[in-house]
Amino acid sequence: MEQLTECESIRDEIKEKLRQHFDGKIVRKDLTKKIKEGANVPVYVLEFLLGQYCSSDDEEVIESGVQTVKRILADNFVRPDEAQKILSKLRQKGSHTVIDMITVHLDIKRNCFFASFSNLGLTNVPIEDEYPEKYDRLLCGGIWCIVQLDYEYVEEEKQNGYPIQIRKLTPIQMPHIDIADLKQGRKAFSKEEWIDILLRSIGMEPDALSYREKWLLLTRMIPLVENNFNLCELGPRSTGKSHLYKEISPNSILVSGGQTTVANLFYNMGRKTVGLVGLWDCVAFDEVAGIRFKDKDGIQIMKDYMASGSFARGKEEKAASASMVFVGNINQSVDVLLKTSSLFDPFPPEMGTDTAFLDRMHCYLPGWEIPKFRPEHFTNDYGFISDYLAEFIRELRKEQYGDAIDRYFRLGKNLNQRDTIAVRRMVDGYLKLVYPDGEFTKEQLEEVLQLALEMRRRVKEQLKKLGGMEFYDVNFSYIDMDDMSEHYVSVPEQGGGKLIPEGMCNPGQVYTASQGKSGMIGVFRLESQMFPGNGKFERTGIGTDRDA
């Protein structure tokens, strides 16, 4: 009971700090769930309205605000199939207020701005210069707005005039983000409080998670905050692997498993248009087992892009900054996969056994360590409005903290160039998320460095299984510059950081030193297992080599 009271007092303290430093940018997440069930609007639009009308502890004010938001959505939200009905109403009444996605472009020939309405289907609607100057996101992909429209048809101007005019435009997404305000606001919170706020902002309840589980969920956010970051997460079903990329961020896209093309993903040579990697901050592939390229060179182009952030199509090379995320399900236990194949086994064969492709993965997130989500894992408390979270994360993509490692540590000799890049990008991502103000101690940096080394080592361990002694250097470490002591980082599922675990081996296990095919001496673990069968003795081999 005392522990429950303590949790509530900590929550109240965080809530008061949020109100003080981020007023109008926070929302109670259970209100989003209530209205979202009956309203087909993006979460970030809904939460912005709730943040405006329901930012109070008074239940009456909250209830009144919820009713106001429902009324605004019912009266003004434009459904694409009702566009003509809305236009007819506008013509009859002479004015009408709509909620729609507005994009503005500059017509250089006529030297003026014009607006396009996504659901209403209107294009080239004249708009005053003050709006794109004040709300620059109108020019960068568009934002959702409440717009008061006037309709006035003048017979004399029917050739050149436009009967629909914009009287007033009010954004219902964050029109612009001041990153300095965020950094200043962060100083009011401890590390633990800030992590809890970030998790509540994506809908999760941190009190139902262990400390390590919190960090694993934060790892999912690194592709949103880091350019050209490649993440893989394989794990059980119902752990929310794709939720963040589909529902929370308006800057990421989830490509469901199935066939895709180079034109769709990278560059369409017929239309001369850049594909998904040029339009989104993060491209996530759901159900990796089903990924298929219609083009023979698809995987090769993807490998090129994952390594360098650019790809060649036709006569020129194109660059993009989108991160790549691969999520999928593991159908067997991790122990079985480690014994019989690799942790990349769910990938299609052309990817899952291609060491050049897998070596480009910066991070392997152990999805099996994240719990299956139940109702108590979803928060009813305050967090950032989804749009505010997504936009400040997007702004942080421009910051760089990866060189912070060099202040206190040096990476060990077993890390090659790709390993170093992967670890630096991961550390950069963690620091941006948890310490956006750039203020952290040596111990806090060491914590994220250890996690980054573990995530990359998990990739390297599987490469060693698939590629043999080419990838023998998996004993990742870092050196403390103060006393020059070297610290090794292991992966939990491999059974600790020692080459041969201490104590008695498991039944059927023995360790031996011998020469491999390349002539290099290594330590081998031999296992014998017994299954029901016909008494025949079979060798399963080492990794993919059944004859070993």
Model-derived segments and spans:
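P-loop NTPase catalytic core of nucleic-acid-dependent motor ATPases
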Residues: 173-251
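Conserved Walker
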Residues: 269-273, 307-322, 338, 346-354
